[in-house]
A protein has these predicted regions:
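Exposed, low-complexity/repetitive linear segments and helix-based recognition motifs
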Residues: 8, 55, 80-82
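Acidic, low-complexity intrinsically disordered segments
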Residues: 62-103
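Residue-level signal for well-ordered alpha-helical segments
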Residues: 7-11, 25, 59, 63, ...
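A short, structured beta-strand/loop element
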Residues: 29-67
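Negatively charged, low-complexity tracts enriched in Asp/Glu with abundant Ser/Thr
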Residues: 1-39
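Glutamate identity and glutamate-enriched acidic tracts
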Residues: 3-5, 23, 35, 44, ...
Length: 103
C-alpha cells in the first residue's frame, strides 16, 4: 500500500498536513488538515478525513469545539476537494479561527 505524507508551510503560523494511502490505484485512507499556530501550539482548524468510514470535514474553533460536515463524496473526490479548499481558503479560515469563529 503506497503511502504519501507531507507538510507544507503556508505562512509562519499556518501549515497544511497531507496524508493518503492508495491500494491498487484507489485512495483507501486520507487526512488533509489546516493547522494554525497560536500560543506556541499548532491547532487543527479544518480537517478532511475518512475516519468512521465516510468522507467528512471537521471544522474547529479556537476553543476546540468541532462541527462535522458529511461530504457525500468518494475518497478520491474528497481528497481533491480537501487540497483545493485549503489551498484556496486557508487565509479566510485562519482569520475566522483566530476570531473565535468556526471556519
Amino acid at each position: 500500500m503506497p503511502e504519501k505524507q507531507y507538510l507544507i508551510l503556508l505562512d509562519i503560523d499556518a501549515r497544511k498536513r497531507h496524508y493518503h494511502v492508495t491500494e491498487t490505484g484507489k485512495i483507501i485512507k486520507f487526512v488533509v488538515q489546516l493547522e494554525i499556530k497560536t500560543a506556541n501550539m499548532w491547532k487543527e482548524v479544518i480537517r478532511y478525513d475518512c475516519a468512521h468510514d465516510y468522507a467528512h470535514k471537521d471544522c474547529y474553533n479556537i476553543r476546540g469545539q468541532c462541527r462535522k460536515i458529511n461530504l457525500y463524496l468518494d475518497y478520491e473526490d474528497a481528497l481533491t476537494l480537501a487540497d483545493d479548499d485549503i489551498n484556496e481558503n486557508w487565509e479566510i479560515y485562519r482569520e475566522k479561527f483566530l476570531r473565535g469563529d468556526f471556519p
